[in-house]
């Protein structure tokens, strides 16, 4: 008489530590403020006041703005990089890093008010994440761009305008928190850049998205940029999830 088949071995008890997926870290909130066209001085004063008043519980913020024409010179900037003193465009000395740059209509400016200590970010890491967000934003409009060692900002990677600067970046860190931020040239009058050595580089070409063939408007690019910035900050925001129409109109 054949013997009964052996009973199957009991399955090994699962390793509790290996079988329970860890909870993902909670995303830190980011408040997005759409400020429309705002004078530079007003934003500069407000950024410093916000940073001085914030507490460990203050949410990080991104301010999206378009400035009337203005040159800004970083705290270690050389005034000699302003080549035309009587250009009619005001010059504001500020406390960010970097040299001289130009802000004006048709350019997106995004200010990042971020608690680096709470996010456990080094300054270099934050700069890299901002640059990646800009590169991804431009790629969404079929524009290839790249960072350049030793020269913060984003530069055209190929074509007849290879090496031209399309986005600038400058930050200030106070009490472990950042302010100032970045600018992306969408569709603007580029002539004011001819009156300066952009970011301190003589002869550096500055370009905008429109000159490279991109037809997206300011608001569309700004929305794309904000979403990429938040993704790289590992944050979450109600404003970034709004429908397109609501996002365009959510100006504070």
UniProtKB/Swiss-Prot annotation:
It catalyses: octanoyl-[ACP] + L-lysyl-[protein] = N(6)-octanoyl-L-lysyl-[protein] + holo-[ACP] + H(+). One of its GO terms (biological process) is protein modification process. It is found in: Cytoplasm. One of its GO terms (molecular function) is lipoyl(octanoyl) transferase activity. Keywords: Acyltransferase, Cytoplasm, Transferase. Residues 1-22 are annotated as: Disordered. CDD domains: LipB. Gene3D superfamilies: Bira Bifunctional Protein, Domain 2 (3.30.930.10). Residues 1-21 have a biased composition (Low complexity). PROSITE patterns: BPL_LPL_CATALYTIC (PS51733), LIPB (PS01313). Catalyzes the transfer of endogenously produced octanoic acid from octanoyl-acyl-carrier-protein onto the lipoyl domains of lipoate-dependent enzymes. Lipoyl-ACP can also act as a substrate although octanoyl-ACP is likely to be the physiological substrate. This is Octanoyltransferase. It comes from Burkholderia pseudomallei (strain 668). The gene is lipB.
């Amino acid at each position: 008489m054949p013997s009964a088949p052996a009973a199957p071995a009991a399955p090994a008890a699962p390793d509790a530590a290996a079988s329970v997926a860890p909870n993902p870290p909670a995303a830190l909130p980011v408040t997005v403020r759409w400020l429309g066209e705002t004078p530079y001085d007003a934003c500069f004063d407000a950024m410093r006041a916000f940073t001085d008043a914030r507490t460990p519980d203050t949410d990080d913020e991104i301010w999206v703005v378009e400035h009337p024409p203005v040159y800004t010179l970083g705290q270690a900037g050389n005034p000699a990089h302003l080549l035309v003193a009587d250009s009619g465009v005001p010059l504001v000395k500020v406390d960010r890093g970097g040299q001289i740059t130009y802000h004006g209509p048709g350019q997106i400016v995004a200010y990042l008010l971020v608690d680096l200590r709470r996010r456990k970010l080094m300054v270099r890491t934050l700069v890299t994440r901002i640059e990646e967000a800009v590169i991804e934003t431009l790629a969404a409009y079929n524009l290839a761009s790249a960072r350049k060692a030793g020269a913060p900002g984003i530069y055209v990677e190929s074509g007849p305008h290879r090496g031209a600067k399309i986005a600038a970046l400058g930050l200030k860190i106070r009490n472990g928190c950042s302010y100032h931020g970045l600018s992306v040239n969408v569709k603007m009058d580029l002539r004011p850049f001819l009156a300066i050595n952009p970011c301190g580089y003589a002869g550096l070409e500055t370009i905008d998205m429109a000159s490279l063939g991109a037809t997206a408007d300011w608001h569309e690019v700004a929305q794309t940029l904000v979403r990429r910035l938040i993704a790289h900050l590992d944050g979450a925001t109600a404003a970034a999830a709004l429908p397109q129409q609501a996002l365009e109109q959510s100006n504070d």
